[in-house]
């Protein structure tokens, strides 16, 4: 998906190369995907949802996209579980999985903190596409993110 998205973005930038007002931005969003049932779903975790005021069973989808204020192209997406073991409902079963596989790498990435994953996503995107700004929620902008970026 990432390589197709970079092709589309380069095509859009080529069409708009004469537009001096075009601003290319990366957009970061984290969305809770609630799952009411699932005691045995791997890496499902409990998190507090501030909108409804309760703790719910969720996966968190961390998404990175590109925009030029007219078009939006999704780039990368990762499901993030809680990195605290007490919040995990079902831990990852990595005992019989080869660590070289994509699934094992995704499981390791799912247990990292969101700012760590965000930084790796932004670095990958900045190598491939033009972007002047990164738009995100204020909580992403922490001391950790500033030092690592």
Residues of each region from the PLM?
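Conserved, well-structured functional cores that handle cations and Mg-NTP chemistry
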Residues: 1-135, 139-149
């Amino acid at each position: 998906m990432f390589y197709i998205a970079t092709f589309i973005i380069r095509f859009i930038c080529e069409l708009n190369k004469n537009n001096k007002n075009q601003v290319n931005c990366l957009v970061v969003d984290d969305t809770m995907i609630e799952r009411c049932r699932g005691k045995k779903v791997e890496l499902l975790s409990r998190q507090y949802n501030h909108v409804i005021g309760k703790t719910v069973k969720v996966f968190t989808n961390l998404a990175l996209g590109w925009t030029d204020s007219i078009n939006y192209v999704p780039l990368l997406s990762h499901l993030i579980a809680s990195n605290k073991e007490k919040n995990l409902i079902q831990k990852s079963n990595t005992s019989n999985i080869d660590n070289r596989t994509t699934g094992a790498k995704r499981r390791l990435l799912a247990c990292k903190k969101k700012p760590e994953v965000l930084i790796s996503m932004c670095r990958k995107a900045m190598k491939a596409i033009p972007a002047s700004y990164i738009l995100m929620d204020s909580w992403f902008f922490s001391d950790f993110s500033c030092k690592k970026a």
